[in-house]
Design a protein with these regions (language model features):
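Second-shell loop/turn segments in exported
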Residues: 36-46, 94, 111-121, 151-155, ...
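N-terminal secretory signal peptides and thylakoid transit peptides that target proteins
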Residues: 1-15
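Von Willebrand factor
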Residues: 27-94, 105-150, 179-189, 195, ...
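Short beta-strand-loop
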Residues: 74-110, 190-196, 200-204
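Solvent-exposed loop/turn segments at secondary-structure junctions
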Residues: 39-43, 85-88, 151-157, 180-185, ...
Length: 245
């Protein structure tokens, strides 16, 4: 029987080292998380700045980083996108693994540097559809696939939000929401930002869903960062929180 030489084994080892991963093989992470931010017309430039800076502060918060690194794989994958009118959405930061403080800091720094994508009307349904598409093409693998959608008004563009929500849930996606409130006296469209029953109730009934789905309220855009920090800790840890209904 002929045995491979030491040189042959060495060459085989070198070849294996430079051979790209098999197509379709995805890196394991504890969660795939899409952060979907509303940049419709009701989000003024000052509010937009608060949102971006708040999101950067939240992802780099020590308690959030601790939650990220506490799972079995000690990392999650995140994609940040913005949305407005139906068909109007853009990936701001494509899929990246966050596995500690340094990676979180790089993500946050990039986030505050990127320009605003656009502004327009409000299509939560289109945002959900686009977010699901990003989850489907992620180069990472995780059992938990979560959309974290933030918004300050109800769906007024495109198809209703609930059917888009239901289709996402059928694919095993969890949708949580950060509901940004607007005092009615400051709203240029009170029926949009302050619908009957309240905006949080609207999101609970039409947007969120899946095991343990929940909403967190930001009383104003100024509290966006604090609210998102609290939300991410619960989301990443997978802890039970206030669920829909």
């Amino acid at each position: 029987m002929t045995h491979p030489s030491r040189r042959s084994l060495t060459l085989l080892g070198l070849a294996a080292a430079v051979t790209p991963p098999v197509a379709g093989a995805a890196e394991p992470v504890d969660m795939l998380l899409v952060l979907a931010a509303d940049v419709s017309r009701s989000v003024t430039e000052s509010k937009f700045k608060l949102q971006r800076e708040g999101a950067a502060a939240a992802i780099t918060h020590p308690d959030v980083v601790r939650a990220i690194t506490s799972g079995p794989h000690r990392r999650i994958a995140v994609c940040f996108l913005e949305w407005a009118t139906a068909g109007q959405h853009a990936v701001v930061i494509d899929w990246v693994a966050i596995d500690g403080e340094a990676a979180a800091r790089r993500f946050g720094d990039r986030l505050v540097e990127m320009p605003r994508s656009f502004s327009g009307s409000t299509s939560i349904s289109s945002a959900i559809d686009f977010s699901v598409a990003q989850l489907d093409r992620a180069p990472f693998a995780a059992e938990r696939r979560v959309i974290d959608i933030s918004g300050d008004g109800n769906n007024v563009s495109g198809r209703p939000a609930a059917p888009a929500r239901d289709e996402a849930l059928a694919k095993g996606v969890i949708i949580n929401a950060l509901v940004i409130l607007t005092p009615i006296e400051e709203s240029f469209r009170p029926g949009h930002t302050n619908p009957p029953g309240g905006l949080e109730r609207y999101f609970q009934e039409n947007v969120i869903g899946g095991p343990g789905a929940f909403t967190v309220v930001a009383e104003t855009h100024r509290s966006f960062g604090r609210s998102l920090t609290r939300k991410l800790i619960q989301e990443i840890a997978g802890a039970e929180f206030r669920s829909a209904g």
